[in-house]
Amino acid sequence: AFAYAPKAPGRKNFLNEPETWDLLEQIRMYAEPYELTLLPEIHAAYEEHIYQTVAEKGYMTYDFFLPGLVIDAIENKRSKYLAAWAKELVEKKINTVNMLGCHDGIPMLDLKGILPEEDIQKLIALIVDRGGMVKNLHGQKNVYYQVNATYFSALGESEQKLLLARAIQIFMPGKPQVWYLDLFAGKNDHEAVKEAGEGGHKEINRTNLTDIQIRQGLQTDVVQKQLELLRFRST
C-alpha cells in the first residue's frame, strides 16, 4: 500500500520515484531509534520485479509469491517454479517475510511472470472449485487480484498437504508468518460471508475461534505437528 502514498498530477501515482523511497526513508529514520524494522507491503506482478527493487533499497519484503507456488507444487507434483524462486531468494539475498494464508486472500496478481498464465487460471479454478471466492474485477475473466479461501480449504482440506505446505514454508528462506486460522486448519466460512452481505467475501478466512475451539484444536495432530515445526524453526 505504501506505493500509493506519494501522488502528483500527471503521474502514474503508483511507486512514484524518487518520492516513494524518500517517504520510506523518512519513516525509517523515525523508526530506527526505537529498533523498529520497516516491512513495506506491495502487491505487484513478479514480472515487474518491484520486490527486487524493495530489497535493493535495503528493506525486507513480503513473499507474496510463496502461497501460490506451494499450492502449485503440491497439486501438480512438481517443484520447478518453487525451486527457482527459492534459488533466486538465496542468490539475490532478498530478505523476506513469508506466509501461506493471511487475513486477506491467496495472492494471484503477484504470480504473473513467475507462473505461466494458464497455470494461474488453473490454480484459481481449483481453489474456487474447493469453495474459494474470487472477486471479478471489471467483468474480465483474466483480471484478478486474489482468491479468498483458507489455506487448508485451498489444499482440499488435506491435513497431510497442510503439513507439507507448512514444512516448505518453515524451510524456505525468510521469516515465517502464520495466520492463526491456518494453524488450526480452519475451513472456508461461507456462513460468515453470507452474514457479512455484499463485499463480505474476505470473511471466508476470518473466523473468530472460541476459547473452546482453540483448546480443542490444540489437542489435534495437525496443530501439534505444525507447532513442532515452528519450535524447530525457532531453535
Annotated model-derived regions:
Residues 1-235:
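Active-site and adjacent substrate-binding regions of carbohydrate-active enzymes
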